[in-house]
């Protein structure tokens, strides 16, 4: 594997690397500043090939250009704008706008510390906002393939979710490694977030994105990882053991999480219609199970504390009486 480019390096006589934001098996993402645009920040993704022979590099270049052309078509406020691709030092780079904010994974971790998980109202808003951007890319014939809390940023300026890290680089890697195989050697999508047909068969469709979005939603609601929310023996979801939501909303999520693709919603429009008829007032009155348990625990602690104080007072009074008797 190629070593990371040194921080401070200027690529294309223009993009100065500031820091490494993250790295996966096939991609390294860095923050850079565009010296040609008043040092504007941008996200620089570097494709990390597992093989470096001439045929692999040539195939990577071809696929990279093809996928870049797809990304170039995307013009949506909830997706970082694609800027350019280039090759330097025998490395392939993809440049996009930098989005300032926190991923929903980081936000969830922060909330877990204070035990204040996402409410039904919050995830309903999140879900509706995400459906809007998914409808846009699906209409372009583009599937994200890798939806998860790590790949959605809540933009700092307006608190709107922004979809990042399309499975493009990993998709390139699978095609480069196994171009002639019906089933690629490497699947695109995270285990337990992507549905079985995507992981096992490499088949990604609109409703596989919906499946991953539903998994992300229940993770935000429960604070649990997907593998903790699945009955491994029956291969069914048991997320409702951890959180209370309105029956209508639970029905929608469960349909999105159906094991068989044919049992799921087949389009974003179907999900939007189902969400549109949910009783909003009732959903706003619901608390998550964790919140209810916290309230119950606090009440119990207060009751125990009060009873303990009464007992201590009685003991003190009893001791004083005994002391008085002994003095006489």
Where are these regions (language model features)?
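Protein kinase glycine-rich loop
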Residues: 17-25, 29
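Conserved short submotifs of the Hanks-type protein kinase catalytic core
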Residues: 89-103, 107, 111
